[in-house]
Structure formats: structure tokens, C-alpha cells
Amino acid sequence: MPLPKMTKYLNAATFGMLLLADAALPAWATTNNRQEEVFQGVARDERGEIAYTEEHRMIYQDGRPQRNETRYRDVQGQEIAVLKSNFTTHPYVPSYSFEDRRFGRQDGTFVDGAWVKIYGRTDQNAPVQQERVRLEENMVTGQGLHMYLRDHMDQLSKGDEIRQVRFLVPLEGRDFVFRIRRLDTPSEPQTVGFNIEADSWLLRLVAPKLEVRYDRETRRLLSYRGASNLLNADQGVQNVTITYRYPS
């Protein structure tokens, strides 16, 4: 498959995976209890204009995220895409379904024991492709990468350690190796930042990196900068900066 086409969907599916942005544990959640948190993300394009907004609804059980539903709306407030994730089978390889209603683009996963069923189509005129891949060690997909960063934040924020993960991209039918390293944030000691990029030097030539910042204490995602999981109106990759609003 030609590299430019591959990186188009790699960027859209992979570099948009952190748009879950939940807290490690809401301040009001208690052990052995089911709680819900609703919050919003605002995505701005490279000109600083609002590209879309995200409405998140996260369900927790015993302090761990169980399910998340994200609804994307354009600047007119019209719903344009939906992402649903279920973390009960695997925290880093959730069963998820994504649909961009503008173009009919779909992709998703379903964890079945030691295997992951994946599917996807690039637009409403394309056939749905289905595959089955083995669930590998250090594999993540979709919003599971955010869960991985949150759970390993202490280790990743120390020194110059570089951690590798295998990111599964349903639209590509395979996984790719990504590397994670800490970013220096001396002016903001209360935050921790990470850079995430492809491990392959060839892929790094055409696939952009992403940067994220977390609150050290709450482990909430504060900002995201990189390629969006929503394509632009011309079905091309768009770079965005997203800031998150949480309930007080």
C-alpha cells in the first residue's frame, strides 16, 4: 500500500487516539461505586479557529473507566461523528466503534480472548474490510493509549526513558510501533508532557508527532496537539490543538 495513503489513515486513527481525556479518578467517585462524568473538549485548527467540539461521557466502576461515549459537533452544533469505547475486556485494547457520519467512514475493534477482530471502511462507497489479529503484548488501540499513558505516567515521567507500544490501526489491518518519551515542562512543574511518534524513521518523515500535557496530581489530560481523528471537509488530515473543560 502506498505510504501517503497509509499515513492518511494512520494519522487519522492513531494520532487522534487520545481524545478521551478522562481523569484518573473524579474527585467525587468512590470505591465500589458506579459514577459518571461529563466534560468537553474544544478543538482549534492551525489558524486558531474552532474546528469542532467533543462531548464526553465516561462511566467509572471501582475507580476505573468502563465505557466512554464521545460525540463530535461542528461549529454549527451539528453532530458529525460518534466514538464509543468499552474498556471492560482490556484497558489498553478497548472494543470500540467510530463513525464519521459526514463521509460514512467507520472503524472499530472487538476483543475476543487472545484475538482482536478489526473492521473498517474509508467512506460510504467502500466495502467494509474485516480482519482478525492476535492480541500482542504492549498492544494498544483507540482511546486505550490514553489509558496506557495514565497508568504508566510515573515511570514515563522519570528521566529520559523511552517506552514502545504496538498501536493497532483497524483501517490498516495491522499494528505499528510507536515510541513515547517525556517532554520537558520547566515552566509548568505541575504538569507532565509526552511526545508520541512512530518508531520507524521512514514513517516519521510523513507521519506527524503529537504532544500531550497532563495534570500531575489528577492525571487529567489538559491539552492535545497533533493530527485529529476527524478528517477535514476535503477528507484530508487536519492538525488541531484541543483544550479540555472539566466540571469543578
Question: Whereabouts are the PLM-identified features?
Answer:
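Sec/Tat signal peptide C-region and signal peptidase I cleavage site
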Residues: 24-29
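Acidic, serine/threonine-rich low-complexity disordered tracts
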Residues: 30-38, 42-90, 95-112, 162-248
